[in-house]
């Protein structure tokens, strides 16, 4: 039983794909920005400001540096192994099957939980937008049970519906997905630039003092919750999750060995610049302790402080569009990873069946889309969202370690992009990821271990038995045994009778 059997780079690249290649550098950059910019600006900046103060911009930079180093490693792997599956496929080549399965299992949870979490934030902004037109949904249908303290809620209906609508868009073809995402990202960027231009004049530098009230990492008296730049970076790291989903589009990308690295890096750079500018403006307009009053809608609080009430509607619209693209890219990435795992036999064939009309993994897309919609509708995601962070950081560590390993074991393999500064770059990526993981609470670790344990059960119960690589190795071994047996029989037939009699 070889749990660490590996796929070769050549076999991965040579396999035919029924998916349609239409994505170019611009589309991939828009895909990355669509995944990154959303929840971070419109939701997490409030919680981050309370944790780090005005130094939140440093927290964003720290998280961005971590993602930047990891992004360089992703870019190299994407140019070397341009197939669907992202970190799952890279781990299969570098470390073997069981590691690949566990990373794939981890990413499935990451994408599902992030989409479900974002659907909760989307619902909040959607309800505010409706209220502006005098439309009020029943409170019980505005959020999952237990989401809002002191308010009786049972089901997040808006979030449930939007996830199903996004699933429909994803299922009917990559061209429709590309157009939808490109248009929404351009609108979102225009609204963010408008916000920056209109609010920068209200910044009061006095609000940036003290710049780092909690230092890098500290505990306040009577509290078990860490405060400071590093804990805030662990929180806002959620904002950058999604660029890795770009690499899942390899089999739908034109010249993936060139365009994938560009799409990953361009989207990270653009998003980081916007995040830092936004956080400096927001903490410059509103003193950081004041974000406690509107922690779930920090941008709305900033607009209130400026008196630019007309901007509220525009920003609400931008938030809705921003979070819609995040969900779209997460659900897209999830379906492509499941497709890759199914194609390798580690998941049932159902998930890998490509619709002949739409050229998409239609059934798998709808299966996980419905599960994600149900999770977003019924489950209080607040207690689980840090699982997204630890899952993503684990994938980053595996990919970064994989680049180190492949540079050592296959130095001459073709790479359309080579990460600069190896081995320093992947080592720094691993170190930064470990630092951010250290900022997460122990409950997150427990849940993560439980999910991994479930993954091991699924692998040994199904994946190991149905692995196509395992079946191929078994057939090759049987054929080799047959050849050896045939050779032995031939030798015996040609031997003297006395020798044959003696050996038998």
Predicted feature locations:
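Membrane-interface "cap" regions at the ends of multi-pass membrane proteins
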Residues: 1-45, 50-54, 61, 68-72, ...
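Helix-loop-helix junctions that connect adjacent transmembrane segments
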Residues: 14-19, 56-57, 134-159, 183-316
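Extracellular loop-to-transmembrane helix junctions
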Residues: 20, 41-148, 227, 267-270, ...
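Loop-to-transmembrane helix boundary motifs in multi-pass membrane proteins
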Residues: 20, 25, 154-160, 254-275, ...
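Membrane-helix boundary/coupling elements in multi-pass transport proteins
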Residues: 42, 83, 106-124, 235, ...
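Membrane-interface loop-to-helix entry segments
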Residues: 123, 154-208, 264-268, 385-398, ...
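Hydrophobic alpha-helical segments of multi-pass membrane transport proteins
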Residues: 128, 191-195, 330, 338, ...
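C-terminal membrane-solvent junction of multi-pass transporters and transport-like membrane proteins
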Residues: 151-155, 350-362, 396-444, 465-473
């Amino acid at each position: 039983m070889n749990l660490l059997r590996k796929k070769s780079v050549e076999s991965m690249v040579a396999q035919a794909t029924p998916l349609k290649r239409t994505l170019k550098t611009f589309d991939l950059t828009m895909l990355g920005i669509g995944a990154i910019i959303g929840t971070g600006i419109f939701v997490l900046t409030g919680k981050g400001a309370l944790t780090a103060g005005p130094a939140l911009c440093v927290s964003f930079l720290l998280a961005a540096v971590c993602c930047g180093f990891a992004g360089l490693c992703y870019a190299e792997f994407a140019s070397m192994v341009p197939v669907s599956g992202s970190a799952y496929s890279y781990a299969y080549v570098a470390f073997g099957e069981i590691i690949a399965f566990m990373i794939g299992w981890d990413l499935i949870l990451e994408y599902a939980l992030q989409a479900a979490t974002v659907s909760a934030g989307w619902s909040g902004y959607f309800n505010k937008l409706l209220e502006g037109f005098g439309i009020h949904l029943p409170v019980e249908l505005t959020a999952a049970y237990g989401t809002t303290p002191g308010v009786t809620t049972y089901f997040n209906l808006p979030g449930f519906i939007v996830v199903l609508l996004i699933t429909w868009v994803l299922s009917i073809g990559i061209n429709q997905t590309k157009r939808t995402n490109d248009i929404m990202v351009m609108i979102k960027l225009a609204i963010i630039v408008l916000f920056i231009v209109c609010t920068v004049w209200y910044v009061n530098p006095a609000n940036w003092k003290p710049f780092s009230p909690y230092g890098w990492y500290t505990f306040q008296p009577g509290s078990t919750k860490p405060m400071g730049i590093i804990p805030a970076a662990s929180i806002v790291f959620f904002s950058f999750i999604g660029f890795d989903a770009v690499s899942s589009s390899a089999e739908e990308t034109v010249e993936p060995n060139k365009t994938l690295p560009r799409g990953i890096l361009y989207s990270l750079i653009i998003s980081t610049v916007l995040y830092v500018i936004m956080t400096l403006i927001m903490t410059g307009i509103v003193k950081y302790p004041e974000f406690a009053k509107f922690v779930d809608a920090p941008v709305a609080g900033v607009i209130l402080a400026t008196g630019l009430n007309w901007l509220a509607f525009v920003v609400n619209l931008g938030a809705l569009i921003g979070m819609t693209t995040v969900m779209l890219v997460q659900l897209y990435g999830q379906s492509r990873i499941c497709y890759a795992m199914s194609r390798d036999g580690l998941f049932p064939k159902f998930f890998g069946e490509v619709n002949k009309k739409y050229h998409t993994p239609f059934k798998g897309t709808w299966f996980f889309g419905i599960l994600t919609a149900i999770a977003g509708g019924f489950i209080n995601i607040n207690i689980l969202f840090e699982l997204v962070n630890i899952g993503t950081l684990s994938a980053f560590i595996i990919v970064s370690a994989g680049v180190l390993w492949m540079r050592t074991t296959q130095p001459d393999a073709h790479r359309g992009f080579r990460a600069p500064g190896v081995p320093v770059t992947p080592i720094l990526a691993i170190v930064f990821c470990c630092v951010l993981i250290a900022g997460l609470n122990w409950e997150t670790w427990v849940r993560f271990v439980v999910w991994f344990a479930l993954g091991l059960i699924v692998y040994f119960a199904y994946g190991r038995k149905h692995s196509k690589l395992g079946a191929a190795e078994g057939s090759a071994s049987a054929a080799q045994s047959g050849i050896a047996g045939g050779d032995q029989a031939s030798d015996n037939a040609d031997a003297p009778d006395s020798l044959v009699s003696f050996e038998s």
